[in-house]
């Protein structure tokens, strides 16, 4: 989910409700607030909690809460809060800013998992954070039953295939790059956690068609998903995602610096 903003850069809860109803209408399986597209680092802990609470109170869909932070104390606080309000799972990427080796990343997750019983999806997005290797994921998976899967947004298909080798009935592997979802499903991925669902149902249609009509799914990727991703990719992430949502819904939305309007045509 994006985090809709008003003209002053504050969270717009009316627009958020529009987004929730849209996502429910296209039949996504989960809502994922406060992730990368939701620009979670731009918000205070209180803002993040308030947004998570609003989403929980206004949707009966299962929710995966973004709890990312380099501060373990902040992660623990967000996970406890999320559990207390009835959110089903958390999504957590490795720490960012300071370069860490795999041992440090393992201990980061171990500290958090030892303090929380909440189901967790590990989030590999090395464009923005430290990279977590499949072997580290494997070690955490074997030690903690609450590790239920991984979202991989690395765009590294070989690395993704290594993640896929970990999948089983209790461990799901999701693709985070919209234009790689079809290929990932071919390789055995559980599904996708994809940003264009904020304003387009292409990914959802692709996923459901794939089960019954592979050729139709491939056509959706070629005609809908890839052109949209190429258009969005011309602009600073994730500004165009916000503007696309605002324009599609006739919302006078805003941006929180360093975000800005990019002028995308829809």
UniProtKB/Swiss-Prot annotation:
InterPro entries: Aldolase_TIM, DapA-like, Schiff_base-form_aldolases_AS. GO terms for biological process: glucose catabolic process. Optimum temperature is 65 degrees Celsius. It shows high thermostability. At 70 degrees Celsius, the enzyme does not lose activity upon incubation for 2 hours. The half-lives of the enzyme at 80 degrees Celsius and 90 degrees Celsius are 20 minutes and 15 minutes, respectively. The active site is at 151 (schiff-base intermediate with substrate). Optimum pH is 5.5, and 50% of activity is found at pH 4.5 and 7.5. It catalyses: 2-dehydro-3-deoxy-6-phospho-D-gluconate = D-glyceraldehyde 3-phosphate + pyruvate; 2-dehydro-3-deoxy-D-gluconate = D-glyceraldehyde + pyruvate; 2-dehydro-3-deoxy-6-phospho-D-galactonate = D-glyceraldehyde 3-phosphate + pyruvate; 2-dehydro-3-deoxy-D-galactonate = D-glyceraldehyde + pyruvate. The keyword Lyase applies. Homotetramer; dimer of dimers. This is 2-dehydro-3-deoxy-D-gluconate/2-dehydro-3-deoxy-phosphogluconate aldolase.
